[in-house]
């Protein structure tokens, strides 16, 4: 199977009212809500035009969301069916649209077990990305999915998706092919990296 981009997804941060375990109301700002776009999108060093992140603080020397090492988030379409087969509550009670997990690119043909840290991906005609690390899901995923503690399920099974930095800026659109330009077989896969991080 040829690896390719199925959807390009962007969104701006939005404020949500949520309730904690004590029924106290809180306002949470999140950028997890992404929607597919029909047009091509320019990808710069900081991410996709028209996309935004809510929490860009630096914690323990890593930016929570955004930044050059988390400029583009890829999520494999194959995981959608796996989640739907395991869950029928919350958001999984209805079919999910691409971008549901907050990804910028919904992709097919490769996943965390076949992608290595440092892999260089050529996307479409000119965009070049380099894989940096797996997603570390936060509590806002629980809100999106409407299942308490769902982020821990993502951690346990390793269906995290992964972030990339932008090596060469360029356009991306649905249907673009993704080619492996460089890969170091001694580097850990995204899944291995994720499992070590949890250990």
Name what the model sees in each region.
Residues 1-124, 128-137, 186, 190-194, ...:
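Electropositive, beta-rich accessory/interaction domains or terminal extensions
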Residues 115-168:
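Glycine-rich active-site loops that engage anionic ligands at enzyme catalytic sites
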Residues 162-199:
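Well-ordered alpha/beta subsegment
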